[in-house]
């Protein structure tokens, strides 16, 4: 009997192979597939609300599979699976969002106002992303550089090595980030502000796994999701980036949650 399929969608700035250690704990139970790098196909540019990125994921699923899949996505990737599942529920057995909060009506309104006023960059990671260092002389140098960064301090060491290995590519100048910082910044700037309109429209089994210390989830107000969307909720100790901090524990929770959704 063939394994059930997980199609994984990565977070902004972290190509899929950064999650190799997480995948290794899932592969006994599931076939794990992914698009290696979202948002870099000129056919699907970054637009406000991530609509073309949604289309990119939907086309990938329709082209690749002849049976329903389990959509697992971290942050950006989770929101994209949510958007596709609302539009094309027949593609999915279930979706599992990893710290990918569906922001509340109040938060959405704030995002829309800030975008209209041209002030959203002041409150998003976009500016620091655009000016991030993007040139090293070796992958060891990439690893050592990010190892010193607060954002990466809690990463599992193997995960960080995978990020250095697969998140940097050799060019004529040296090693540069595989996920272009300019595109990462555009994605932050294009954060959807219309997600509340989808309440009541999700028709597939769904779960949300969150980090206990996730600032992103706190700002998004999970109370909206609890009240208006049919998600099961579970939490794992860690930040917004907990799948990269605790890959084994994350895999165990994904397996447990999917079994519950399948009852």
Question: Language model features by range: what are they?
Answer:
Residues 2-44:
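Conserved HGGG/HGGXW glycine-rich cap/lid loop of the alpha/beta-hydrolase fold
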Residues 33-72, 111-114, 252:
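Active-site loop/oxyanion-hole signature of alpha/beta-hydrolase fold enzymes
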Residues 68-110:
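Conserved hydrolase catalytic core segment
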Residues 95-135:
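Flexible "cap/lid" loop of the alpha/beta hydrolase fold
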Residues 198-238:
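Conserved loop-alpha-helix segment in the C-terminal half of the alpha/beta-hydrolase fold
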Residues 238-248:
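Catalytic histidine-centered segment of alpha/beta-hydrolase-like enzymes
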């Amino acid at each position: 009997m063939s394994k059930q399929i997980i199609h994984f969608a990565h977070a902004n700035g972290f190509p899929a192979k950064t999650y190799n250690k997480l995948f290794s704990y899932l592969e006994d139970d599931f076939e794990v597939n992914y698009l290696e790098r979202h948002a870099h196909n000129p056919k699907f540019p970054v637009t406000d609300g991530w609509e073309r990125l949604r289309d990119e994921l939907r086309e990938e699923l329709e082209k690749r599979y002849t049976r329903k899949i389990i959509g697992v996505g971290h942050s950006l990737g989770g929101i994209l699976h949510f958007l596709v599942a609302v539009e094309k529920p027949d593609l999915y057995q279930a979706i599992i969002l990893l710290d990918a909060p569906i922001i509340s009506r109040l938060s959405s309104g704030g995002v829309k106002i800030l975008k209209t006023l041209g002030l959203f960059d002041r409150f998003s990671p976009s500016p620091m992303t655009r000016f991030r260092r993007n040139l090293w002389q070796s992958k060891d140098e990439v690893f050592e550089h990010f190892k010193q960064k607060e954002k990466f301090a809690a990463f599992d060491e193997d995960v960080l090595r995978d990020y250095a290995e697969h998140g940097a590519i050799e060019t004529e100048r040296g090693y540069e980030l595989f996920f272009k910082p300019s595109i990462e910044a555009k994605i932050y700037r294009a954060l959807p502000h219309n997600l509340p309109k989808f309440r009541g429209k999700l028709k597939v089994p769904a779960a949300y796994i969150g980090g206990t210390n996730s600032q992103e989830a706190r700002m998004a107000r999970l109370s909206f999701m609890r009240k208006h969307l049919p998600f099961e909720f579970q939490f794992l100790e860690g930040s917004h980036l907990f799948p990269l901090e605790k890959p084994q524990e994350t895999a165990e929770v994904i397996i447990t949650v999917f079994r519950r959704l399948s009852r």
